[in-house]
Amino acid sequence: MKVLLTTLNSKFIHTNLAIRYIKESIKDLVDVDIREYTINNQLDYILKDIYLAKYDAIFFSTYIWNIYDIVKLCENIKKVNPNVIIGLGGPEVS
């Protein structure tokens, strides 16, 4: 299974530690990648980048600054790949 752990950081200089911890926990079980974007990236660019990599599952780390864009991305990802598994984590999920 090809898995993506991703997020939209608020700035280019930010790094998401949560997805790195998760990657370390599952790297022996699945083929896992990390891709980080920022809220300044165009959603079409992010969608294309994710779609072309052909992931089986995509998990987003969500926060107050990215939740609306991530929801839009999830809707569009499902339109182009209805079989992909999508999961959300982080403080905005609860």
Predicted features by range, described:
Residues K2, A18, I22-I26, D31-S94:
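Glycine-rich beta-alpha loop elements in corrinoid/cobalamin-binding modules
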Residues M1-L17:
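A short, flexible N-terminal coil/short beta segment enriched in small residues
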